[in-house]
């Protein structure tokens, strides 16, 4: 087996490492650098340029130089409007509403652009090692969706690499930090602020096991955003002074972008920096062209004011990760800062202040730590590293749609992967021959508030009374965090499934808001769930009443039937208009009273005729959304969803 390389495929820069003598080392590229800009360009003659050389010619070839492609990979067109407005190259809608880019009249997918970067990294590794390289471990942000992870694997395949594992970036950073501390028992918080993403993970290290306890983050907050506030500041000031909008000139905006990035870097070590851009534009004065220049001083304090909202936004994922892991700041032993943007002094100060003055660990290189960790995982998979176990997690819960538009979680967020969950359901209408499984991701109680991942149908179920068919539903997540869902009819053996490879990922707003909304709307969600549960109990009760009435009509008088039917109709009407907890409690009392009436009539019917046939009231849907290990039956139902003319996946769980 040849060498397995570890790759940090970054938004701004990428890095490759390999294990030598049991230790990870950075591979120096052909230009002599330890990192490679994640930039691809096509020259006038159609020649492809990657890395530092592509960055050098970006100003004079702005329209055909692609950067920050990681912000588009695996995402939908409508979710990327802000990102598309910032780049100097041309974006076009792709297949399945994805984002493609145009370079010299050729349309490329983000996977193809990423593959060009990966191909250069692979070639640099082959030159360094003196042997062919065909296998790799690639890192991705912890908050990357299933579609983004799959797209990254596809990019690796295009580059001629077999991707053995997709590893979360903060987890890889912890690996590089803890390789020589395998027998330490400690809790580590990794704060990873890269060019385009922010991830925060909390890991437990001990007995050679790296176990991720919780992860949180922002998929679209990184160094690019800090550059953008300087770009906007420069462009706004120039517009005010010269009445020229530099945003309309792609070459000018590219120069502003590069100068802003350098200013940000300078201000990490200097209190002030000068931005000097001669001949940035030309104005006409008295009929003659007059060149315009930018020469301005930017102080660190000014930059921190411009970026204050961004700095504050980096703290929220820390709070969320601590909450999810049930830990306090005092229980964190070490804080690791990784990613190039973690060098910004305001970021370091904000993190230190949040942890009550505890100094972050700055012993690892923030640009290289992730690639080094990927190389360690590559060594584990290649058999070079022994006795190291990495246990990662999923960032958001996965589940399906059930009765009443409820999102039923099958696998909770922060569950260790790889993992699988299997549950057996049954139909809830007589003669049902098909179910549609709707798979979702998120934390809210109702389907409409979560992200749809995909749908599939299981057909060919033999017609049978409700409750008879047994449908086995399985959720399986591999070590890369990629989801497979399958459904099988136990009676016929007929099966159907889906590999969630939908290209549309979560928007940045969705990811940021999803967990906040789960808390903000917790009370409203609970009322909605109780209302749906009550409605389900009522439907089961009405089904029981109608079935009993059909089989034993001769034993019930009209005087007994009429008030029951009136009560049922009144309760049905009330359930359609309930809007608060007081009304809910009133309806709950009415339902209980109706139950007692039915039980009394049933008992009387039994006394009259011992052969009476009754249909028992089914257990409620509340069982399904509670503890699934209590051995009780759990009821869900199939119903027609008239909004999209499809049958939603609603079942009765019997195991």
Curated annotation (Swiss-Prot):
CDD domains: ASKHA_NBD_HSP70_DnaK-like. GO terms for molecular function: ATP binding; ATP-dependent protein folding chaperone; unfolded protein binding. Gene3D superfamilies: 3.30.420.40, Actin, Chain A, domain 4, Substrate Binding Domain Of DNAk, Chain A, domain 1. The keyword Phosphoprotein applies. Keywords: ATP-binding, Chaperone, Nucleotide-binding, Phosphoprotein, Stress response. The modification Phosphothreonine is found at residue 197. It holds the Pfam family HSP70. Induction: By stress conditions e.g. heat shock. Belongs to the heat shock protein 70 family. HAMAP family: DnaK. Acts as a chaperone. This is Chaperone protein DnaK 3.
């Amino acid at each position: 087996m040849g060498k397995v390389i570890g790759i940090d495929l970054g938004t701004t820069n990428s890095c490759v490492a390999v294990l030598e003598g049991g230790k990870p080392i950075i591979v120096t590229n052909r230009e002599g650098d330890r990192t490679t800009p994640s930039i691809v360009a096509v020259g006038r003659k159609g020649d492809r340029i990657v890395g530092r050389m592509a960055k050098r010619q970006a100003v004079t070839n702005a329209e055909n130089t692609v950067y920050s492609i990681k912000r588009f990979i695996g995402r939908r067109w409508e979710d990327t409007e802000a990102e598309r407005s910032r780049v100097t190259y041309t974006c076009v809608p792709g297949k399945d509403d994805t984002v493609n880019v145009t370079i010299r009249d050729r349309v490329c997918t983000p996977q193809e652009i990423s593959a060009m970067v990966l191909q250069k990294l692979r070639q640099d590794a082959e030159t360094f090692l003196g042997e062919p390289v065909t296998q790799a471990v690639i890192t991705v942000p912890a908050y990357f969706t299933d579609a983004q992870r799959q797209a990254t694997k596809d990019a690796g395949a295009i580059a001629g690499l077999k991707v053995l594992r997709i590893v979360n970036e903060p987890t890889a950073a912890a690996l590089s930090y803890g390789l020589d501390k395998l027998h330490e028992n400690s809790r580590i918080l990794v704060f990873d602020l890269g060019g385009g993403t922010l991830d925060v993970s909390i890991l437990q290290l001990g007995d050679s096991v790296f176990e991720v306890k919780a992860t949180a983050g922002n998929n679209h907050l990184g160094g690019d955003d800090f550059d953008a506030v300087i770009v906007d500041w420069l462009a706004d000031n120039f517009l005010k002074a010269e009445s020229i909008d530099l945003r309309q000139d792609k070459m000018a905006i590219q120069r502003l972008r590069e100068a802003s990035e350098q200013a940000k870097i300078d201000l990490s070590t200097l209190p002030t920096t000068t931005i000097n851009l001669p001949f940035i534009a030309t104005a006409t004065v008295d009929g003659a062209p007059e060149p315009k220049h930018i020469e301005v001083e930017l102080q660190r304090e000014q930059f921190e004011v411009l970026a204050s909202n961004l700095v504050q936004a980096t703290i929220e994922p820390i709070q969320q990760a601590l909450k999810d892991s049930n830990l306090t700041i005092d229980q964190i032993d070490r804080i690791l800062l990784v990613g190039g943007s973690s060098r910004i002094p305001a970021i370091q100060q904000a993190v230190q202040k949040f942890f009550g003055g505890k100094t972050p660990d700055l012993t690892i290189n923030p640009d290289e730590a992730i690639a080094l960790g990927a190389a360690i995982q590559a060594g584990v998979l290649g058999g070079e590293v022994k006795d190291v176990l990495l246990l990662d997690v999923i960032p958001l819960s996965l589940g399906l749609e059930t009765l009443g538009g409820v999102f039923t979680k099958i696998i909770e967020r922060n569950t260790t992967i790889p993992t699988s969950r299997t549950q057996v359901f049954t139909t809830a209408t007589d003669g049902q021959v098909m179910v549609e499984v709707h798979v979702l991701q998120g934390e809210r109680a109702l389907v409409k508030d979560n992200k749809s991942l995909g749908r599939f149908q299981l057909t060919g179920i033999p017609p049978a009374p409700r409750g008879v068919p047994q449908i086995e539903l399985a959720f399986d997540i591999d070590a890369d965090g990629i989801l497979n869902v399958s459904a099988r009819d136990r009676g016929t053996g007929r099966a159907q499934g889906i590999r969630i490879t939908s290209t549309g990922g979560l928007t940045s707003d969705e990811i940021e808001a999803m967990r906040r909304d789960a808390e903000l709307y917790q009370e409203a969600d609970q009322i909605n769930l109780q209302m749906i549960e009550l409605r389900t109990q009522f439907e089961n009760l009405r089904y029981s009443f109608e079935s009993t009435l059909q089989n034993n009509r001769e034993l019930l008088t009209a005087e007994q039937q009429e008030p029951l039917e009136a009560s049922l109709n009144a309760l049905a009407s009330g359930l359609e208009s309930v809007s608060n907890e007081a009304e809910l409690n009133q309806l709950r009392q009415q339902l209980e009273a109706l139950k007692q009436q039915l039980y009394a009539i049933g008992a009387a019917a039994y006394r009259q005729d011992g052969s009476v046939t009754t249909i028992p009231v089914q257990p409620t849907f509340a069982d399904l959304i509670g503890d699934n290990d209590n051995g009780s039956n759990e009821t869900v139902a199939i119903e027609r969803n008239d909004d999209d003319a499809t049958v939603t996946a609603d079942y009765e769980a019997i195991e």
